[in-house]
Amino acid sequence: MKKQLFKRKLLYASLLTAASVAAAPVQAEKAQPSNCQPIKNTEAIAEGTRVNKQALGKWKNKKIHKINITINNIFDESDPAENKWIYRLANRIQVNTRENTIRSQLLFKEGDEVDPERIEESLRRLYKKEYLLDVKLELAEQCGDLVTLDLIVRDAWTIEPRISAGHEGGESSSEFGLRDGNFLGSGAELELIYKTDAERSQVDYKYRSENFLNTRWLAEFYHADLSDGENNRVILEKPYYSNNTRWAYGFEVETLTQVDKIRMGDSLLNAYSHVTESQNAYLGRALAINSKRTYRLNVGVTAVDHAFSHVEQTQQLPDAEQQFYHWVEVQRQTNEFKTYTNLNYIKRAEDIAIGQEFSVRVGQGEWAETDSMTRLIAQYSNALALQGNHLFKFDTYTDLVYTNEDQSLANSIWGLSGKYHYYVDGKNRWQIRASWDRGNNLPEYRELTLGEEVGMRGYPLSYQRGDNRYIVNIERRFYSDIHWFNLIRVGAVAFVDAGRAWQTGNGEQADHLASAGLGLRLHSSKSGNPAVIHINLSAPLVKDEQLDDYLVSVAVGTEF
């Protein structure tokens, strides 16, 4: 009954929220001031930055008279290397980002006082948008105590015909379709894609906008037809869109039906139909804000149901699982960033949050039909930059469910990871990454697997599984100056991996695995999509008769 009431409330909330979304009102044109003079920008904007901070600081607390926005094409036709017919054609085909799309996302507006920190944050958030390659701000004109700002952005290529095939962990996959990450210049994502892999085929339909109708609302509508089920998701949210946002609220509803196939190596251990229904709604408030950090308090309610049924290969069904609980959450967000180049991408600036961040969510409610539970979901991370060429990142997480009837943990998992980057020089990097995960009373579909899908290169998908896992990756990376056709950046990597996954009490049956190999990395310099193509040749150093001497994989990753 509670779940039905909750679902109805979500429906009513969605209708009311959707009705409240409206475009920003049009402001009347202001009178032009007199005695205006251009501002001489004597110092160029430093590489890896988006504004001359020193020059901007001189205008702190002065009024912004006007903000001019210039949106440049993807290809720079003033550059002879890019002034070719194919690039000029691409510039004509691409629908440039609309000025209103950019203006509606700025954290400052005409008539505001110049706030350097807020302007820098706004530029950083704009740069993260998939449809922009570059963002710069210049001081253009002064009119007494008024200042005019020039915002200059460069569009990214966002129309992506998806015709691809990959081979990873001994399994093949393919995609065919079309995706536009900046539909008609609105900043919205629209996709229609057909996908196949070893488990299933599916057709994805998706619309997502982080500034729905040029407002601060995020909206996503997703549907997928699966060969073994379907997936539907709706998100409507007014998030914390800046460090200084005081209120946030929203909801998400998702249903997923698919056949889970439990594999270990070449063996199919079990299979069953799995239906997941999840609903989540929250309300949040920023408690304390300063230039270094922001604290927030969120409250919400979550309902999750897992149901299972037989298919032809079913050996044993997991127990059904129902959760319905209210929760409260405290968050700490760092507001300090450091910009790096040649980190996760090739020749592209990246803003890395420096300092401590955490979130702690505690909830109580129903577990199954007759039991109650306490749930703890927590995350902590800390990034530390030392001497300009050392970057450390530490993360830990926990997701615990304590059932009151059994007085024990159920379907719980926790772990920690660390990552170290050492900058040898402008083109060469060392990266060491290590992680450990531990589960307790995990159902099969949530067990920890080890194979190429989690970075254990040279081994098939889900080669080992259990409730314990560790993995260590050591990489020597090379970020070259090669720029094929002014489109594709090229990098290379040599790597060694080690790891193991095993079941508690049965560890002697799982070997410690190791592999070594070489790889190429290809990254588009004109696309805002963070995808990186991985081409790896890896050899397992610990193997059995089932494994080949080497494994060639071609896959798309989210970073180098």
PLM features: residue spans?
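Immediate N-terminus of the mature polypeptide
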Residues: K2-L15, A23-Q407, Y420-F560
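Conserved GTPase G-domain substructure that encodes guanine base recognition and part of the catalytic core
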Residues: W414
